[in-house]
C-alpha cells in the first residue's frame, strides 16, 4: 500500500491526549477532519497502526490533533517524533486544476523550452502556495502558484510550464 506524508508529531499538547502536529500536507482541514483515518509510522518509517481523528484545531503554526481511544498524555507521549500518513486509497478525487503535493513535487519546471529546475518542496506562507524549485548551480527559485506565473501543469508528462515575472528570479 502507498502512503503519503501528512505531518510529523512534534510534541504533546496538554494532558488530555492531544498532539502537536507539524503539517506537511495539502487540504489540512480534510486530512484532520473528525473520523479521518491516518496511519502512524515510527521514526524509522515502520507502520505502527491506524488512528481515527477525534478532534482537530489550529494553534499558532501547529495542528492540534486528538485520536479516538487515546485520551491521556500517557497514551500518546510515545508517539512524539512519529509521522502521520494517509493511504492512497483514502485520497479524494480533485477538481480540474487541483493537485496533491506528491503529484507536484519532482516535476520539471520549464519556461518555454528552457528547463529551470525541479519542484522540491511546497510552502504555504499565506494566500497562495509557493513552489520551491531546485536549480543547478543557482539558488532555489521561489515560485508563487498563481495564474500569471504557472501556465500549465501536466502531471502525466512530468512538466510544469511557467512564465517568470520580472523580479521573481533574483539571479538574472
Swiss-Prot record:
Family statement: Belongs to the RimM family.
Stretch forming the signal peptide: none
Pfam families noted in UniProt: PRC, RimM
Function per UniProt: An accessory protein needed during the final step in the assembly of 30S ribosomal subunit, possibly for assembly of the head region. Essential for efficient processing of 16S rRNA. May be needed both before and after RbfA during the maturation of 16S rRNA. It has affinity for free ribosomal 30S subunits but not for 70S ribosomes.
PANTHER family attached to this UniProt entry: RIBOSOME MATURATION FACTOR RIMM
Annotated TM spans: none
Domain PRC barrel: 96-168
GO cellular component: cytoplasm; ribosome
Main subcellular localisation: cytoplasm
Subunit relationships: Binds ribosomal protein uS19.
GO molecular function, one term: ribosome binding
SUPFAM superfamilies, per the entry: PRC-barrel domain, Translation proteins
Location relative to the cell: Cytoplasm
Keyword set, alphabetical order: Chaperone, Cytoplasm, Ribosome biogenesis, rRNA processing
Biological processes, Gene Ontology terms: ribosomal small subunit biogenesis; rRNA processing
Domain comment (free text): The PRC barrel domain binds ribosomal protein uS19.
Protein name: Ribosome maturation factor RimM
